[in-house]
Amino acid sequence: MIHTLLRWVFQRLYRIRIEGDSSQFQQSKLLITPNHVSFLDGILLALFLPIKPVFAVYSSISDRWFMRWLKPYIDFVPLDPTKPLAIKGLIKVIERGQPVVVFPEGRISVTGSLMKIYSGAAFVAAKSGATIIPVRIDGAEFTPFGRLAGVFKRRCFPQITITYLPPTTLPMPEADSARTRRALAGEHLHQIMMKARMETRPQHTLYEAFLAARTRYGRRSPSIADISFNEDSYQGLLKKSLGVSRILQRFTRADEHVGMLLPNATITAASILGASLRNRIPAMLNYTAGAKGLQSAMKAAGIKTIVTSRQFLEKGKLTDLPKQVSEANWVYLEDLKDTVTLADKLWILFHLLFPARAMLPQKPDDAAIVLFTSGSEGNPKGVVHSHDSLLANVEQIRTVADFTPRDRFMSALPLFHAFGLTVGLLTPLMTGARIFLYPSPLHYRIVPELVYDQNCTVLFGTSTFLGNYARFAHPYDFARLRYVVAGAEKLSETTRQVWQDKFGIRILEGYGVTECAPVVAINVPMATKIHSVGLLLPEIESRLITVPGITRGGRLQLRGPNIMKGYLRVENPGVLEAPAAENAEGELQQGWYDTGDIVELDEKGFCTIIGRVKRFAKLAGEMVSLESVEQLAVKVSPEAQHAASAKSDSSKGEALVLFTTDSQITRDVLLAQARSSGVPELAVPRDIRYVKALPLLGSGKPDFVTLRHMAEEPVTNASEQSA
């Protein structure tokens, strides 16, 4: 009677929605593993699960007075994590055929993300052979019974969804000791819980996800600021997005690729959202690529209109670009202000009240944005991402990293770069964190000052950028940082060590590619391995393809929800080339993306980058990693910059060339270091060329195309070469 009454009350108050197959609970041995977001979770499961389970409750809670009142209505087993016999008792309950509910996190989430997973629940599942049914509870975290005060906007009676995920099992891992087996089982259960979160993520477009974040965190919550230091709330950003969308549709058509040549600024974020909600596809142009690069991008993606700013062109010394790329229809944001009519203002006002009505019909799988590869190894390619692939990557990041609305992101990497767009804009926007957009990562003195001034807690960049920030920063500038993430190039040991010594901060290295939106793997506080790029993100499938001549690792191929829709190439303008890769048997399989990177995956799944297939030189039949040549030079001269390339050689096929900013490096010094490091002499270049600075791309990566051309050029000055 009481059970029925409470179920009716909760159904009316919280509009409980049940998703998933309830028939799967008829297993003989059953372990139910829900996430834990509020004090309501146990009551919700007791009322709405299709079976009557036994709850495993920590003894510190089961001994409290209110649990005595619940005892006649809810079966529970006290669980003392300090006593191994308690785990054995739980296994016996399952073996008797009684379904058991265990909260693997052991506590209510204080971040909104998954907390640490205790291995006890995994050991119970593996030892008993029970079927695991993951359950997701969404919405209860917004109630006053959650522990997210100040993180989410509290609501008394939000809608709560309970999702039953497909059943799975967890075999006992093979290991030498019981402790190791238990730890491995816990890691497997963590993977199951992360997969459950990913499978229940909402299917939205970018604009719908933005509106959902606006509702979740509050429309007046501070959201985004730029170098003007004027901070916009979610409502302020919505207003600007609606204004851009209204005007943009006058000179563009639906499904058109609209070029955007804009700096890191609030208006750029508004332009992306504004174009998206009216079915225009922003094509983020690299303003460091020059006229030739812009023309290549325009040809590949069929871009006719470029949105930019006169002020930006003047400050960036790019005023000649419109003349050099005269075939484009250049639209200046400053000129649009005078074109706003009364009808436009009324339209914007109406849709501020009813923002969902502003969006034209579109689906999550529709194209959302065009990014361009760095061009470090050839012509830049247009990479088309859907709404879903971008938001899937955001959710993958949020599943492994505990970002919250308390965080403040310093976003200096350009928004035309996938790293800057997804990690620097979309992730904090969908998390409720505040964003500070800065127009250049190259201002090595200013960025640390702004990190300090804005109380930033999250900073990301390339190894080169982070190393230079460390040079000019005061030891206290980074005192509030929780996450410092390095990507886009290998993290140098010098940079890693200086951050540890000067600031007491561990840099977390990650790995991504534009085609994967971009994050593929990342080290996080919960799972870190030094000199690796971390674990692959949840829901990403991987395989390694053997490459002849390369004995260590294999060529990494990926499949997952964050993979691009396809390429737009200069050679085949306007035609979308869907991702496909050859498997080990040489069969072309759709949906797989070949990264071209040689990696190793250890027994726990940590990924270590060996190098790119294209960054190997073949010397007399032997494959030599150009990155290993660079690392050898770094050990000899850690303060200088080094980049290796290959050149044609009539006797060996190819020969190594080392470009360095250290004029004192000689082959003899490199040979001595190679012998002490166990590096073969074949990997020591004879051609060593001093340069004042390495050619770099806008992302901070070395420009390997230019370096290859430089390597092929004959050495005209004897001082440029040593052997």
From Swiss-Prot:
Family under the similarity heading: In the N-terminal section; belongs to the 2-acyl-GPE acetyltransferase family. In the C-terminal section; belongs to the ATP-dependent AMP-binding enzyme family.
NCBIfam families documented for this protein: PRK08043.1 (NF005959)
Region (AMP-binding): 233-646
InterPro entries registered for this protein in UniProt: Aas, AMP-bd_C_sf, AMP-binding_CS, AMP-dep_synth/lig_dom, ANL_N_sf, Plipid/glycerol_acylTrfase
Cellular component per GO, a single term: plasma membrane
Alphabetized PANTHER family for the sequence: ACYL-COA SYNTHETASE, MEDIUM-CHAIN ACYL-COA LIGASE ACSF2, MITOCHONDRIAL
Transmembrane parts of this sequence: 258-277, 409-433
Protein name per its UniProtKB record: Bifunctional protein Aas
Membrane topology: Multi-pass membrane protein
Principal location listed in the UniProt entry: membrane
E.C. no: 2.3.1.40, 6.2.1.20
CDD domains noted in UniProt: LPLAT_AGPAT-like
Keyword Repeat on entry: no
Disulphide bridges: none
Protein location: Cell inner membrane
Residue ranges that the Swiss-Prot or TrEMBL entry lists as coiled coil: none
Encoding gene per record: aas
Protein keywords: Acyltransferase, ATP-binding, Cell inner membrane, Cell membrane, Ligase, Membrane, Multifunctional enzyme, Nucleotide-binding, Transferase, Transmembrane, Transmembrane helix
Gene Ontology molecular function: acyl-[acyl-carrier-protein]-phospholipid O-acyltransferase activity; ATP binding; long-chain fatty acid [acyl-carrier-protein] ligase activity; medium-chain fatty acid-CoA ligase activity
